[in-house]
A protein has these predicted regions:
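Surface-exposed binding patches on compact interaction domains or structured appendages
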Residues: 1-15
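Short, solvent-exposed loop/linker segments at the N-terminal edge
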Residues: 5-6, 169-174, 303-312
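Short strand-edge motifs at loop-to-beta-strand transitions and within beta-strands
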Residues: 10-14, 241-249, 312
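A short beta-strand micro-motif common to beta-rich folds, especially ectodomain repeats
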Residues: 12-14, 23-35, 314
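C-terminal edge beta-strand
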Residues: 36-50
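Local sequence-structure signature of Cys/Sec-based thiol-disulfide redox active-site neighborhoods
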Residues: 56-103
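Short, solvent-exposed loop/edge segments of extracellular or virion-exposed proteins
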Residues: 71, 295-307
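Short, conserved sequence motifs used for protein processing/export or organelle targeting and
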Residues: 89, 96-293
């Protein structure tokens, strides 16, 4: 009020498009008065629609695809840090397109029964070795990064992703609980695998290039298996099915829950080759809800990380 004090009331209307996802969408709106002395932040929450544009929306959408790289490694392996570096470079070249697991074997101090089972499945005898989507084997050399990238692109060129996953995870005492749903578009034979991984595990690592490292930060270490390590088999009789799974595993002594994440991948049987390949892979920190992810509109709200004053998208 000019020349004095008082209160001005104001209002505005927001019109949004229908929510085509199967998740609640959240956006943040910041409102600031002209002289910037007063501001308010409003959170807008939009429920999903029912029917074909709600619960069934996933059927007409294209799943976002990520490849899975199993990096077979060991703490005594002096060449293994080089492959880890090449894999990191490949991830930088293909942002948010590669999920990884560091599969320790060969007597490594970080070896588990699950990692031993994976090494047996893929016949691993040499370290390091990379296996991409269960299809391609990559050795350690000066072309490792390029081979990983080309293998990831080869999977996407050959197969359309027909699986998606969503889940919630929670901690109860020393247990991590996982409530998981797999969304499958095509009838066929499948396997689902879920591991509890730990990042930033400080332990020695032999390194022929940079010298042995007593405090190497190991990431993507398998700590526990929610499922059978080689995958829990299931069959989809008709197109468009949802399979639900419920698991709980104990956090190993000495592990830090804040450094742990859940990784899930779905394998599909290729009827032409009688071989399973990784159709899609996903990961999220323990306690973080994983939503279905689509190519067409991103995933979740489309406004993750939006701060007051930034643009929002509905």
């Amino acid at each position: 009020v000019e020349g004095g004090s008082g209160v001005n009331d104001g209002s505005f209307n927001i019109t949004v498009e229908p929510n085509p996802t199967i998740d609640v969408r959240v956006a943040i709106i910041s409102v600031t008065v002209e002289d910037a002395t007063v501001s308010r932040t409003v959170t807008v929450i939009q429920a999903p629609q029912a029917g074909e544009t709600g619960d069934d929306a996933w059927k007409s959408k294209e799943f976002y695809h990520r490849s899975l790289v199993l990096r077979f490694t060991a703490d005594w392996c002096g060449y293994c840090p080089q492959m880890a570096s090449a894999l990191n470079d490949a991830q930088q070249a293909l942002p948010d397109k590669i999920e990884t697991i560091a599969v320790h074997g060969g007597g490594s101090s970080l070896q588990t029964e699950a990692s031993s089972a994976l090494a047996g499945l893929y016949g691993i005898t040499n370290y390091p070795t990379g296996v991409i989507d269960g299809l391609s084997y990559v050795p350690n050399n000066d072309r490792t990064k390029d081979l990983i990238i080309s293998s990831v692109k080869e999977t996407e060129d050959k197969y359309d992703a027909v699986s998606g996953a969503s889940w919630t995870s929670s901690v109860s005492g020393r247990n991590v609980n996982l409530n998981l749903s797999a969304y499958i578009k095509e009838a066929g034979s499948y396997k689902i695998t879920a591991f509890l991984l730990e990042d930033n595990v400080i332990a020695p690592q032999t390194d022929y290039k940079n010298g042995d490292q007593p405090d190497y930060a190991h990431s993507g270490i398998i700590r526990s298996a929610f499922t059978y390590p080689l995958g829990e088999s299931f069959t989809v009789e008709e197109d468009y099915a949802v399979k639900d799974f419920l698991y709980s595993v104990e956090v190993p002594s000495g592990s830090v829950v804040d450094n742990m994440r859940v990784i899930v991948y779905v394998q599909k049987l290729d009827e032409d080759t009688s071989r399973y390949y990784v159709d899609n892979a996903f990961s999220a920190a323990v306690g973080v809800t994983q939503s279905l992810q689509f190519v067409t509109d991103g995933w979740g709200t489309g406004n993750e990380g939006v701060k007051p004053g930034e643009d929002i998208t509905f």
